[in-house]
Amino acid sequence: MSVVKEPTLADFYVRKKLYTGMGHNYYGEPAWPNDLLYMFPVVILGTLFCLVSLAVLETGSIGDASDPFKTPEEILPEWYFYPVFQILRTVPSKLIGILLMAGVPVGLATVPFIENINQFQNPFRRPIASAVFLFGTLVAIWLGIGATLPIDISLTLGLF
């Protein structure tokens, strides 16, 4: 009968290894063969199974058939361009709209420098970066929903 030592945070050496960046594998267990040989194929095959099953279950036709002789009421871009479309549609000056769109990548590039003194990777311990991310996500969703509505209620979404 072998003795298996369970890791505990009361052990000084375990805390030292966790402090130096050891991951979830106990006592420096290598990634090969456990992670690379067993866990990765399970995740890859599970993802492939989900994609194939969803593709088989989905019907072939979505929406109305295309009619080249009938122009739609409003031509909308693809869904991933909705927030940008909403900015250009609602801002009175197109130059300001373009500057707002250029400000998004500039703002995203500055987020790491805001909290560069914070060494934690846990998002709950990086409140400024998490708040900027959540605010940007909510604004993008708000603008994306507003792009599908008429222009007079697009910014308020008809709520107020």
UniProtKB/Swiss-Prot annotation:
Location in or out of the cell: Plastid, Chloroplast thylakoid membrane
Keyword Chloroplast attributed: yes
Signal peptide boundaries: none
Membrane spanning residue stretches: 36-56, 95-115, 131-151
HAMAP family reported for this sequence: Cytb6_f_subIV
One cellular-component annotation, GO: chloroplast thylakoid membrane
Gene this chain is encoded by: petD-A
Family assignment from sequence similarity: Belongs to the cytochrome b family. PetD subfamily.
Role, per record: Component of the cytochrome b6-f complex, which mediates electron transfer between photosystem II (PSII) and photosystem I (PSI), cyclic electron flow around PSI, and state transitions.
Organism: Bigelowiella natans (Pedinomonas minutissima)
Protein name: Cytochrome b6-f complex subunit 4
Subunit structure, as described in the record: The 4 large subunits of the cytochrome b6-f complex are cytochrome b6, subunit IV (17 kDa polypeptide, petD), cytochrome f and the Rieske protein, while the 4 small subunits are petG, petL, petM and petN. The complex functions as a dimer.
